[in-house]
Amino acid sequence: MRSSSKQEELVKAFKALLKEEKFSSQGEIVLALQEQGFENINQSKVSRMLTKFGAVRTRNAKMEMVYCLPAELGVPTTSSPLKNLVLDIDYNDAVVVIHTSPGAAQLIARLLDSLGKSEGILGTIAGDDTIFTTPANGFSVKDLYEAILMLFEQEL
């Protein structure tokens, strides 16, 4: 029970730090947590927590790259479907454009990149809430669009 309470305190402190302060590296987050009394924290633990809570690196108003939690979503978890993060998918002759909730584009783009060329994805470019995806050789933009639509429908 004691360790789960320490874990809850760590999670609470971690989320509060990401909301209140700007961190440009995982090392800075480690130091801030250590200053709050979490001696056993290290970079790999912080990296896992960033992934678990859907934190992304994005540019703030001063154009600095900082870690943040997706603001409007609360925190996506492994039980929340990624489909909820995708707001719209459309295409033209060159690219498929995916609009996401703020802060979620990099998470979705990483998923798409992991599928790779065999699934028709040559690559992605992600901003804060928009992703451009281009098809690999042998795939049309429409094929890629339909594959992405099916992928997010299956996430229900």
UniProtKB/Swiss-Prot annotation:
GO molecular function: arginine binding; DNA binding; DNA-binding transcription factor activity
Keyword DNA-binding belongs to the record: yes
GO biological process, alphabetically ordered: L-arginine biosynthetic process; protein complex oligomerization; regulation of arginine biosynthetic process
UniProtKB keywords: Amino-acid biosynthesis, Arginine biosynthesis, Cytoplasm, DNA-binding, Repressor, Transcription, Transcription regulation
Entry's family note: Belongs to the ArgR family.
Organism: Enterobacter sp. (strain 638)
The organism's taxonomic lineage, starting at the top: Bacteria, Pseudomonadati, Pseudomonadota, Gammaproteobacteria, Enterobacterales
Pfam families registered for this protein in UniProt: Arg_repressor, Arg_repressor_C
Protein name, per record: Arginine repressor
This protein's pathway: Amino-acid biosynthesis; L-arginine biosynthesis [regulation]
